[in-house]
Every structure is written in structure tokens, then in C-alpha cells.
Amino acid sequence: MAIKIGINGFGRIGRIVFRAAQHRDDIEVVGINDLIDVEYMAYMLKYDSTHGRFDGTVEVKDGNLVVNGKTIRVTAERDPANLNWGAIGVDIAVEATGLFLTDETARKHITAGAKKVVLTGPSKDATPMFVRGVNFNAYAGQDIVSNASCTTNCLAPLARVVHETFGIKDGLMTTVHATTATQKTVDGPSAKDWRGGRGASQNIIPSSTGAAKAVGKVLPALNGKLTGMAFRVPTPNVSVVDLTVNLEKPASYDAIKQAIKDAAEGKTFNGELKGVLGYTEDAVVSTDFNGCALTSVFDADAGIALTDSFVKLVSWYDNETGYSNKVLDLVAHIYNYKG
């Protein structure tokens, strides 16, 4: 029996979550809520400048979407409490608007009949965050959870392997991050972040990110040991994390590479990093990861070691596809939780 999900918000992540769900037998999208017109919704699902045409049929019938012959209820409610998820048997609501990131606001989905809620962004309160390959085993039946951020999903698995093998004394992270929808096509008003208001296609823009600090929430042993920042760059998708750390146990760069490779292949960490962490020694660039479902692909040849305790590690991620696939992994994990 497939897990029935409803998606609130059909933007970049909402649509890529939907696309990813089409490749899973265990998850079925039964409802979508967004304020856009259903015909426009169908158009945006069919055609994607980054990921290409939708692999299947998309039609509109009686105000609903019909995708590959299956009818999906479409609504346009501003208040999640009015979504009546219960009427279509929604097990888990995927909150992808970016607007309801606290327990209080996301709980409206449960009022509407959903059993549980997954937030597709870092929570803005104490709502717990879970990252596959890092702390799924800490889930204890909570009805509202967060899948953290795309950058935390890249950084945390890598940091876990390094810390639990060699120990991280402290570290700094930089993410070179693709453009996102909040940025401006040309210079425009941005009262809180002046640099963020500059034209996205013209600039490399320094920005803040809470991704490194958030690692401490999913991996408590690293709480207070990592911080970081971002550079927004003029590419449409795929980002890369640069993690520079002081190690507690000296190690050669080859030993670090081997530890990450073993984890990626599922030979260590009880196989928890397989399907999450990747490893490559190829001469890759960002577009080589477009559409990659892994959330962190370690680039062995891009990293460097200054000493046997001070190293720079580089890991790629498709900030849309990888993250959206892990949203669905979290959906499946909390649905199948037995206590």
C-alpha cells in the first residue's frame, strides 16, 4: 500500500518532489495545493528549464491534474487548515511553501487531516530536523519534522564520516551555491540583505547560511564546532560544499579518502551512507551532477591537505534533486516507524 502524500507549495522543491515520487512504488501524490492556476501548474510540471520535460503524461481535467492517468486533487487554499487532507486519505503532508516552518503553523496540516508533516526547509523553532545517513535513528514518532536544508544534507553526511573516524576539532564550511528563486534577476530591493538584492546573473554574492550550525542539531557531537557562509553564483543548479577542518586524529589524505569511499559503498556505518554519500575520482564539474539523487558526492581529487590534521574536503550536490529525494526518504521513514 503506497504512502499517500499531499504537497503544499508547487515551486522548485514541490515540483521536484513530485517528479521524484513518480519513480517510487511506495509513495503516491494524491493532492497538490498552490495558489497558481491548474493549467499553469500543468505547464510548469511538463516543462523544466533545469531538469527537462516531464517523463510522462500531464493533463487537466475538471480542475485537477491527471498525471500518467492518475487524478490528483488540486486546491488553492491560503490556509493549510482548510486543505481537508483527510478527505483524500493523506498520510503525510509535504510542506513546501517555505511559509509554515514552525510546529504551530505546520500543525494546521494535521488539523486538515494529515497524520504527519515533513517540512522542506530548516525549522524556525525547535521542530526536530532529520538528515538521512546522519540521524534517522533519532526519530521517535514526532508528527512534525524537518528535512533540514539542501546544504545541511550535503555537509552532515560528510562531516559524520570524518568526525566519527578521525574527529573534527573545529571547521569552516563554504558552499558555492547555485541561484535560487529568492534572488533578483537584476538589481532590486532587498532591505534585509543588500548584497542579496544584486543581479543574480551578474555577480558572485557572499551570503549567510545556517547549514553548518544546523549540523550540530542533527549531529550533536559537532554542536558549536562548525560554522560557515555561502557564495551565490550565476548557475541554475548544483552546488558544492568546501569543508575545511582541523582533525583530532592525524590522518593522511589517502586515509580520509578511503574512509569516505567505504562509507559511500555501504561498507561502514551499518550501510547508512549508501544512497546518500557518493565518491568520485573523475575530473567532474557541476553540471555532471544535475539530476543526481545523492545528497553529497565527495570529489576526491578536488580536496587538499596542508598537514595531516588540517584538510579541505569538497563535496557536490544537486540542491534540488538530491534534497527532494531525501524528503521522500524521510516521508517513508516516519511512515514506517514502529517505535
From Swiss-Prot:
User: Which molecular function term from Gene Ontology is one that the record holds?
Assistant: glyceraldehyde-3-phosphate dehydrogenase (NAD+) (phosphorylating) activity
Family membership, please give it. Belongs to the glyceraldehyde-3-phosphate dehydrogenase family.
State the GO CC annotations. Answer: cytoplasm
Domain of life according to the entry: Bacteria
A biological-process GO annotation? glucose metabolic process
Indicate where this protein resides in the cell: Cytoplasm
Q: Does the keyword Oxidoreductase apply?
A: yes
Q: Which organism is it from?
A: Haemophilus influenzae (strain ATCC 51907 / DSM 11121 / KW20 / Rd)
Positions bearing the site annotation: Activates thiol group during catalysis: H177
User: Any keyword Transcription?
Assistant: no
> Top-down, what is the taxonomic lineage of the species of origin?
Bacteria, Pseudomonadati, Pseudomonadota, Gammaproteobacteria, Pasteurellales
Residues the record lists as binding D-glyceraldehyde 3-phosphate = S149, C150, T151, T180, T209, G210, R232
Query: What function is annotated for this protein?
Result: Catalyzes the oxidative phosphorylation of glyceraldehyde 3-phosphate (G3P) to 1,3-bisphosphoglycerate (BPG) using the cofactor NAD. The first reaction step involves the formation of a hemiacetal intermediate between G3P and a cysteine residue, and this hemiacetal intermediate is then oxidized to a thioester, with concomitant reduction of NAD to NADH. The reduced NADH is then exchanged with the second NAD, and the thioester is attacked by a nucleophilic inorganic phosphate to produce BPG.
Biological or metabolic pathway of the protein:
Carbohydrate degradation; glycolysis; pyruvate from D-glyceraldehyde 3-phosphate: step 1/5
Q: Which gene encodes it?
A: gapA
* UniProt name for this protein: Glyceraldehyde-3-phosphate dehydrogenase
Q: What class of enzyme is it?
A: oxidoreductase
Active-site feature positions: C150 (nucleophile)
What quaternary structure, including any partners, is listed in this protein's UniProt entry?
Answer: Homotetramer.
